[in-house]
């Protein structure tokens, strides 16, 4: 039996593509464009795992498909190469993180090339290249000039072990850091912030313009968290102090019986009485040790301390005790809430715990038993009594504004973006702080501000980054003799990834971020494929920067990514014991089709789980390519199931994909290829072209491969294969298995040219129609014959054909035919006696 040798074929075609620059981006202005983007990887020391190629294969199939359809295709790859692991490695080993990063990139690139992806490597970007981060810094200076980058003393999530602050999104629900699992404490520090909140409404509105999964849009909507309500001002009794509360339910103000401030609220110390001072100070200290996520956990027991002061409810003059509690965050809203315990579960629990008044102001429910959180007509609410929710809100806002104690207000949950990191391995923030108290941005002519090479990569000990140790870089003197100090914080890893898709469009431009005409030609990105874990942060940050650049006239579109697709996760083979604990694969043996723990003998259940080093179930693509070939890996990952589903890796599935490709190879290389069309494959071939074309366009790659299999099965039943159908089929399979596609194309054409730009096959609609149908002939209700006849034969013709059939003749000879019922295209029923 013939098998193809992937170890010879694959390197041969990879060399051909590289030598001939086969995938250089097309520049013919008369052609339509297609920009296919992958989320570029962080080049870790571990290299690629089999999860990476799933998304990369999808965009590669689309890119090859669109090239064949006559598009200019931009399909680039690059490296998101700043980040903590390289810095940690440098601190542990004393080596330069740049060298470590370069080695990792070389390894990633080798692995990617071995998979036959059609990237245009002339457009490769690397976020750690000064020629790249010059423009990251340039964008920062523009944000600074527009007042969108500012310094603030903010409570940050400080991780002592990492020597840096981390963003809210990087804190796990248990209050530890996502990276390393270290304790996180709240600590006030001078930080750079980006004013993403200035774009909140546009970030929300423009989600309507993009073709993204609704689930991702919802996550962004929730993160932005728009709410409409009112600000209400409360005076503090016997003082000249007041504070403002934002509420979405100003109509419930008559039911506000106490107020709660965040422990960090600026007013707390000023209004705390001497009796309560010690308890308040102690509580503030405890709150500072908790992350925002831990503080707002709904399940935790409510804690709080009274300040000793009272606020005056503006609508009824009632006194409301003012408490502090850690579930109120200084960074959210105004850092103060009015509590309506009758109609809010958290307020109700707090009121019950500390014996505070509960006054119902909405009809329905028993507030002694539980908070009533549904809608009802207003009661105990003076001029609002009897009104429904909408009417009462409108009337209360009108009253607040007339009395000068409040106003209508729209707020967002979105916070400004904490942009600085106390790390070495990141883009230097191009700002100089002068001894006269002013700060200036580094002028564009002096960009890039290059990260200094240093052996001294260790925390400075002051909370500043290791750059504070590099004094000859740090200290500068202006022409007028004024001394200055460079900013020591660096940018987060999110910075370089917020605009990389723009640099791919014009990666070698030294004068500007990218040429306007090229940006007009290529934007927006037509398809962006990557993991759903980036749903909020990366995508929101990139959209924010894009909108700023749009306002500056740098980019021509409001949105960067027209269509987004999240591939599923490839899960590893893993096993669970009776307690539900996962067991590493090297501790498992298979006996008689069941799995057992090597040490305890306990029978285990097979359960797919995320691939991880600890479970020893990470599959390295190098091993798969060596054993089965890159084309097999590509076809298998696309055939596993829908692209957005999470599916377990299977060796059997891999073997099945390889067997299929061997059958394809045999079909084209051993079947007699003829210039004469017998017509036998007309229907299945045209169906295959139609189905594969439509399904690739819709990214339904698994069903496209299934249809290719249908064609192979049909073609194998014929003695000969029509040359045009053989070529068309090879073109259809080439985006999935490009090395094999090229090899078989040469076997059929000997053209010496790549298959990549051969026009995509078309189909003949008339051949999709069945010209023949199978009908059954029943005698006495039993099927006696099956006949293939021309479609749409009349009743009379059908009856004639059926009665002339040999098998039918044998059944009816010597019998009386009572009646013949003929149903066109279906059956003939003969009644005899």
Curated annotation (Swiss-Prot):
PROSITE patterns: AA_TRNA_LIGASE_I. The keyword Metal-binding does not apply. InterPro entries: aa-tRNA-synth_I_CS, aa-tRNA-synth_Ia, Leu-tRNA-ligase, Leu_tRNA-synth_edit, M/V/L/I-tRNA-synth_anticd-bd, Methionyl/Leucyl_tRNA_Synth, Rossmann-like_a/b/a_fold, tRNAsynth_Ia_anticodon-bd. It is found in: Cytoplasm. A motif ('KMSKS' region) lies at residues 610-614. Keywords: Aminoacyl-tRNA synthetase, ATP-binding, Cytoplasm, Ligase, Nucleotide-binding, Protein biosynthesis. GO terms for biological process: leucyl-tRNA aminoacylation. ATP binds at residue 613. A motif ('HIGH' region) lies at residues 41-52. Its EC number is 6.1.1.4. It catalyses: tRNA(Leu) + L-leucine + ATP = L-leucyl-tRNA(Leu) + AMP + diphosphate. Gene3D superfamilies: HUPs, Isoleucyl-tRNA Synthetase, Domain 1, Valyl/Leucyl/Isoleucyl-tRNA synthetase, editing domain. It comes from the Bacteria. HAMAP family: Leu_tRNA_synth_B. This is Leucine--tRNA ligase. The lineage of its organism: Bacteria, Bacillati, Bacillota, Bacilli, Lactobacillales.
């Amino acid at each position: 039996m013939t098998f193809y040798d992937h170890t010879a074929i694959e390197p041969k075609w990879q060399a051909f593509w590289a030598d001939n620059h086969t995938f250089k981006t097309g520049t013919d202005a008369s052609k339509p464009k297609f920009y296919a983007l992958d989320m570029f990887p962080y080049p870790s020391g571990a290299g690629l795992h089999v999860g990476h190629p799933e998304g990369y294969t999808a965009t590669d199939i689309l890119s090859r498909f669109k090239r064949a359809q006559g598009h200019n295709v931009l399909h680039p790859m690059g490296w998101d190469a700043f980040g903590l692991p390289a810095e940690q490695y440098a601190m542990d080993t004393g080596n330069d993180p740049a060298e470590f990063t370069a080695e990792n990139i070389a390894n990633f690139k080798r692995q990617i090339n071995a998979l036959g992806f059609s990237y245009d490597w002339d457009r490769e970007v690397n976020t750690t290249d000064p020629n790249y981060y010059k423009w990251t810094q340039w964008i920062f200076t523009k944000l600074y000039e527009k007042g969108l980058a500012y310094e603030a003393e903010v409570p940050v999530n400080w991780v002592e072990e990492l020597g840096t602050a981390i963003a809210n999104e990087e804190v796990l629900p248990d209050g530890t850091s996502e990276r390393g699992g270290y304790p996180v404490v709240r600590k006030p520090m001078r930080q750079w912030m980006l004013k993403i909140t200035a774009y909140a409404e546009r970030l929300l509105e423009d989600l309507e313009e993009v073709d993204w999964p609704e689930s991702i849009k919802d996550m962004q909507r929730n993160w932005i968290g728009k709410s409409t309500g009112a600000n209400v001002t409360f005076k503090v009794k016997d003082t000249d102090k007041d504070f403002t509360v934002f509420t979405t339910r100003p109509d419930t103000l008559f039911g506000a019986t106490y107020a709660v401030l965040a422990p960090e609220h600026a007013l707390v110390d000023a209004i705390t009485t001497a009796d309560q001072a010690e308890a308040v100070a102690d509580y503030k200290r405890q709150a500072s040790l908790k992350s925002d996520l831990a503080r707002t956990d709904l399940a935790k027991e409510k804690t709080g301390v009274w300040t000793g002061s009272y606020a005056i409810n503006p609508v009824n003059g009632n006194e409301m005790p003012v408490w502090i509690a850690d579930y109120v965050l200084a960074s959210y809203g105004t850092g103060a809430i009015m509590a309506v315990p009758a109609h809010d579960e958290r307020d109700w629990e707090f009121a019950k715990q500390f014996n505070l008044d509960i006054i119902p102001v909405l009809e329905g429910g028993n507030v002694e038993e539980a908070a009533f959180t549904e809608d009802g007509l207003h009661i105990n609410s003076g001029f609002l009594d009897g009104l429904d929710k909408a009417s009462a809100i409108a009337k209360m806002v009108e009253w607040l504004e007339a009395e000068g104690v409040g106003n209508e207000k729209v707020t967002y949950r979105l916070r400004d973006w904490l942009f600085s990191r106390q790390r070495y391995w990141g883009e230097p923030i191009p700002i100089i702080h002068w001894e006269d108290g002013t700060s200036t941005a580094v002028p564009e002519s002096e960009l890039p501000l290059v990260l200094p090479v240093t052996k001294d990569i260790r925390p400075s000990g002051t909370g500043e980054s290791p750059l504070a140790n590099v004094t000859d870089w740090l200290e500068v003197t202006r022409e007028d003799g004024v001394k200055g100090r460079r900013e020591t914080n660096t940018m987060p890893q999110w910075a370089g990834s917020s605009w990389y898709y723009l640099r791919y469009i014009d990666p070698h431009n030294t004068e500007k971020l990218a040429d306007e005409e090229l940006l007009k030609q290529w934007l927006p990105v037509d398809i962006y494929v990557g993991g759903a874990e980036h749903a909020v942060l990366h995508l929101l940050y990139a959209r924010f920067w894009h909108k700023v650049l749009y306002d500056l006239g740098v980019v021509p579109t409001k949105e960067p990514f027209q269509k987004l697709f999240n591939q599923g996760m490839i899960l590893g083979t893993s096993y669970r014991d009776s307690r539900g604990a996962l067991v590493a694969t090297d501790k498992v043996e298979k006996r008689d089709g069941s799995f057992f723990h090597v040490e305890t003998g306990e029978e285990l259940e097979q359960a797919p789980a995320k691939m991880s080093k600890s479970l020893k179930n990470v599959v390295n693509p190098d091993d798969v390519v060596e054993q089965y070939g890159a084309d097999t890996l590509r076809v298998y990952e696309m055939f596993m199931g829908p692209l957005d589903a999470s599916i377990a890796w299977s060796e059997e599935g891999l073997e099945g994909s390889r067997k299929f490709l061997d059958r394809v190879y045999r079909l084209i290389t051993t079947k007699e290829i003829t210039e004469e069309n017998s017509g036998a494959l007309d229907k299945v071939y045209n169906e295959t072209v139609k189905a594969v074309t439509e399904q690739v366009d819709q990214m339904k790659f698994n069903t496209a491969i299934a249809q290719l299999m249908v064609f192979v099965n049909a073609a194998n039943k014929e003695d000969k294969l029509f040359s045009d159908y053989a070529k068309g089929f090879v073109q259809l399979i080439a985006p999935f298995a490009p090395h094999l596609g090229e090899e078989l194309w040469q076997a059929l054409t000997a053209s010496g040219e790549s298959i990549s730009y051969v026009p995509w096959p078309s189909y003949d609609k008339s051949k999709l129609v069945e010209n023949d149908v199978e009908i059954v002939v029943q005698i006495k209700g039993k099927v006696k014959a099956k006949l293939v006849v021309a479609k749409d034969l009349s009743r009379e013709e059908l009856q004639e054909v059926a009665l002339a059939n040999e098998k039918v003749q044998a059944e009816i000879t010597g019998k009386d035919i009572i009646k013949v019922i003929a149903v066109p295209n279906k059956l003939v029923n003969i009644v005899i006696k």
